Amino acid sequence: MPFRLLARVAAPISLALLAACASPSDRNITLAGPDASARASGSSAASVDESGVAVRPIKYARQKPGCSGTCPRIEVDSIAIESAPKLTQLIDNALAYMTGVDPDRSGNYRSLQEYEQHFWATAQARDVTQLRARVRDAYKGLITVELTTGQYLTGAAHGIPATQFLNWERDRNRVLALNEALVPGRQDQFNAALQRAHGRWKTQLEDYQRDPGAFDRMWPFQPTDNFALTRTGVVMKYDAYAIAPYASGQPEVVIPYSELTGVLDPKWLPG
């Protein structure tokens, strides 16, 4: 299959889509619930990770049933969060949603279990899907989860990666959007702080150092709303190809909290 660069490899998930993903239907929950361990033989008991959140690892690798030789494969390295079953369900549904990078191969699935059946029916021999989730940080009443997918399609030049942050408010049991984290009317100031941080970030890249003008023409700054509130700053995540060549991976630009006084809602600032 020839490689095709999509305009947005995997656009950040909107709040509306997140709400739709978080369906209350138990049939969609494949990382949570009493029978999850039976479905994911690699799961184990819950433990407290370095962020202080109790998580149960869900880890397994499978190839297409009945296939021999070179076979399509799915690898899952995810988590169930014991204290937040609704977040666990959202992780499952959002990871499935993030696989829809190719409109010719997307399907009507809303969970990893449903995606797996779709994948076996449509995948070519060397296709591999990797699905990962981890707690990035736990800060100011938030659980920040990092979702990562990698799709390696038969005949493609290289993989198609995507990352999405979920900032989960424990007290409200919902995802926090970027505009909700800001002081009302301060989006422009936030974007200006992001652009300054981006300016510092790009100076570390060899491509920029070699020819700053050419780099800026090819890879101009653009804002993103894919963010993570962490103890060290606001991490802004970009897709591959968004602001740098593929070799740069999925760039992270960190805005220090010192630049966000009067911009970020004070409840999210340190101290």
State where each predicted segment sits.
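Bacterial N-terminal signal peptides that target proteins for export
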Residues: 1-11
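C-terminal motif of bacterial Sec signal peptides marking the signal peptidase cleavage site
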Residues: 17-20
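Compositionally biased intrinsically disordered regions enriched in Thr/Gly
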Residues: 22-271
